[in-house]
């Protein structure tokens, strides 16, 4: 049995804890608020500010974990190097977590060091620099904070008149006090995918069937598997994913995102060194092993005999229309649970914000079925659940 310190206790962490419990592991779930989803299924829990390096060190010394598994990005990530030097396994590695937290570090690694195809980009430390970069890149363009998550601070800028708002919005959405943004060429893509990639301690890099997804404001709204893409494009994406994960080092599951263009091919977008929100579709039984089980096996060094597509699947999120500190209630469960070949997952978040992700609907069908129809079904059913 390993003692695992989980940093971040959202819905992805909750599913990881469930997988870990089924393998007899001991989990300490941490977050900045009490009653977070993963805490509800963990052995122990801690509530503290994970951006506070001293507090993070205190918790690590208190529990002396064998493994630290970051589940979110709002962590004092540079401290992970120290824990790794002390002999604690950081997942997938301290290097990976630090690089992927910073869009500057990961983009320069991908584009300049590894030669992966990406959108053209510049950095801006002031509004003037942002205006200069936009003039070079042209409109529309995408502006993002160097450090943020779930689309925070991200905007699509269609004209010079919108740049001042994009600058303020980006800085306000940035982690900490960093006032530097990345401005990117807008790629006219036909689709975007997540390629769940598994790096192992003792074994080859493995890939899950590609997952298509739709985002709004940089945040996941629906996903489906398998995404139908050109085999040559899939091979190109797999090669890029293997290159970047090998450079970042470590064992675990990664969510590697790509833009696909029929005209211009495959563009590397970004990656997360952990299970991915779009990968929740694997909870519909689309694969023999879902993304959380794969992450756990890679972390523990357990064998993964292979990844097989068992059936097709689609997911659609359930969002809160309200903000309240009261525990949320849900209408429509009877209707949803009466649907065939459908799972409902309520995450158990103790309070709501407007557009906060509160649950997900998962639909499945045999291989070869109509995937577009399944996507429509998942969205239709998700709309039946009312958060109040």
From Swiss-Prot:
The keyword Cell inner membrane does not apply. It is an enzyme of class 6 (ligase). It catalyses: N(1)-(5-phospho-beta-D-ribosyl)glycinamide + formate + ATP = N(2)-formyl-N(1)-(5-phospho-beta-D-ribosyl)glycinamide + ADP + phosphate + H(+). GO terms for molecular function: ATP binding; magnesium ion binding; phosphoribosylglycinamide formyltransferase 2 activity; phosphoribosylglycinamide formyltransferase activity. Keywords: ATP-binding, Ligase, Magnesium, Metal-binding, Nucleotide-binding, Purine biosynthesis. It holds the Pfam family ATP-grasp. ATP binds at residues 103, 144, 149-154, 184-187, 192. It comes from the Bacteria. Mg(2+) binds at residues 257, 270. One of its GO terms (cellular component) is cytosol. Pathway: Purine metabolism; IMP biosynthesis via de novo pathway; N(2)-formyl-N(1)-(5-phospho-D-ribosyl)glycinamide from N(1)-(5-phospho-D-ribosyl)glycinamide (formate route): step 1/1. GO terms for biological process: 'de novo' IMP biosynthetic process. N(1)-(5-phospho-beta-D-ribosyl)glycinamide binds at residues 11-12, 71, 277, 349, 356-357. Its EC number is 6.3.1.21. The keyword rRNA-binding does not apply. Residues 108-300 form the ATP-grasp domain. Involved in the de novo purine biosynthesis. Catalyzes the transfer of formate to 5-phospho-ribosyl-glycinamide (GAR), producing 5-phospho-ribosyl-N-formylglycinamide (FGAR). Formate is provided by PurU via hydrolysis of 10-formyl-tetrahydrofolate. PANTHER family: FORMATE-DEPENDENT PHOSPHORIBOSYLGLYCINAMIDE FORMYLTRANSFERASE. Belongs to the PurK/PurT family. Homodimer. This is Formate-dependent phosphoribosylglycinamide formyltransferase.
């Amino acid at each position: 049995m390993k003692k695992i310190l989980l940093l971040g206790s959202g819905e992805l962490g909750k599913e990881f804890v469930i997988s870990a419990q089924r393998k007899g592991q001991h989990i300490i779930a941490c977050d900045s608020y009490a009653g977070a989803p993963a805490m509800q299924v963990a052995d122990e829990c801690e509530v503290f500010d994970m951006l506070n390096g001293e507090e993070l060190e205190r918790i690590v010394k208190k529990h002396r974990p064998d493994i630290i598994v970051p589940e979110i990005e709002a962590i004092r990530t540079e401290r992970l190097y120290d824990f790794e030097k002390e002999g604690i396994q950081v997942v997938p590695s301290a290097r990976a977590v630090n690089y992927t937290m910073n869009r500057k570090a990961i983009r320069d690694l991908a584009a300049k060091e590894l030669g992966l195809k990406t959108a053209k980009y510049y950095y801006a430390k002031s509004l003037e620099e942002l205006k200069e970069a936009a003039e070079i890149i042209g409109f529309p363009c995408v502006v993002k904070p160097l450090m943020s998550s779930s689309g925070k601070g991200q905007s699509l800028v269609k004209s010079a008149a919108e740049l001042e708002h994009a600058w303020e919005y980006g800085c306000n959405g940035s982690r900490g006090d960093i006032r530097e943004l990345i401005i990117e060429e807008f790629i006219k893509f036909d689709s975007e995918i997540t390629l769940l990639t598994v790096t192992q301690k003792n074994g080859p890099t493995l890939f899950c069937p590609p997952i298509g997804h739709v985002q709004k404001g940089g945040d996941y709204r629906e996903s489906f598997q398998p995404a139908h893409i050109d085999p040559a494009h899939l091979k190109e994406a797999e090669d890029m994913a293997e290159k970047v994960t090998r450079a970042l080092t470590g064992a675990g599951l990664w969510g590697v995102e790509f833009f696909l263009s029929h005209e211009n091919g495959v563009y590397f977008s970004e990656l997360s060194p952990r299970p991915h929100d779009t990968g929740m579709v694997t909870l519909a039984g689309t694969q023999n092993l879902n993304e959380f089980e794969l992450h756990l096996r890679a972390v523990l060094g357990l064998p993964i005999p292979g990844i097989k597509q068992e059936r097709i699947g689609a997911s659609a999120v359930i969002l809160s229309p309200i903000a309240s500190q009261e525990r949320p209630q849900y209408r429509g469960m009877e209707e949803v649970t009466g649907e065939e070949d459908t799972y409902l997952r309520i995450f158990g978040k103790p309070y709501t914000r407007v557009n906060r992700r509160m649950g997900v609907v998962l639909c499945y069908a045999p291989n070869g079925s109509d995937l577009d129809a399944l996507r429509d079904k998942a969205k239709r059913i998700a709309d039946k659940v009312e958060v109040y």
